[in-house]
Design a protein with these regions (language model features):
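Terminal amphipathic alpha-helical/low-complexity segments used for targeting or macromolecular assembly
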Residues: 9, 15, 26-27, 39, ...
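Structural signal for interior beta-strand "rungs" in well-ordered beta-sheet cores
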Residues: 1-143
Length: 212
């Protein structure tokens, strides 16, 4: 259904519902949109809804994503590239998911939450606050479980970048500081290391607060 813009090479399996009206009770039939990039896989029973005029009016999905069976992408979500939604993972309205993020099976993401690039949410996680890039989280509600080191290695992160990311994680999560204090301590190094700046910028702009 639409209006929907679908890129090339996408694969839709049986019973997937793509571009349907959203389930937001404020929706009154406005001509909102779904935009899908290239080479995504939507497995059986996956549902993706269009946006609402209360937000940007569109749901946006990038390229090379895998949405396993019975996953759900609600209205106004913005999904990056190369993400994986394992079976039953659900993103509520207005959620943003960064590139290469992975949601384990039956993960539930609260409205307006942002999940950073390369983050990993363990199966059954309930995500109520923003998840910074590179983090692993698990539980209901979810808590931090370290850095997604193996995923970063597979994507070409070198030992120096990994070391700086680990140090930043300790600064935010292990020293008993406030978020503001941790960001101040990381400011100088973040200006020199792009991978670290992605981490600190995300935290500084987290409107819901971060998982801690």
């Amino acid at each position: 259904k639409g209006p929907s813009t679908i890129g090339k090479g996408n694969h839709f399996f049986q019973f997937a519902s793509i571009g349907e009206d959203c389930q937001d009770k404020k929706y009154k039939g406005e001509a909102t949109e779904l935009i899908v990039g290239d080479y995504n896989v939507f497995r059986e029973g996956c549902s993706v809804h269009r946006g609402t005029i209360q937000d940007q009016g569109k749901t946006i999905i990038g390229s090379h994503n895998l949405f396993m069976n019975t996953t759900h992408i609600a209205h106004d979500c913005v999904i990056g590239d190369h993400t994986i939604f394992a079976s039953g993972a659900q993103a509520a309205g207005h959620v943003h998911i960064g590139d290469w993020a992975i949601l384990g099976g039956m993960t539930g993401v609260h409205q307006f939450v942002h999940i950073g690039a390369h983050a990993f949410c363990g199966g059954g996680s309930i995500v109520l606050k923003d998840v910074p890039p590179y983090l692993m989280v698990h539980g209901a509600p979810c808590v931090p479980a370290g850095i997604n080191t193996e995923g970063l290695k597979r994507r070409g992160y070198d030992s120096e970048a990994l070391l700086e990311i680990r140090r930043a994680y300790k600064e935010v999560y292990r020293k008993g500081q406030t978020v503001a204090e941790a960001l101040a301590a990381l400011e100088e190094k973040a200006a020199q290391v792009p991978e670290l700046k992605l981490f600190t910028d995300f935290i500084a702009n987290a409107s819901r607060g971060i998982v801690r």
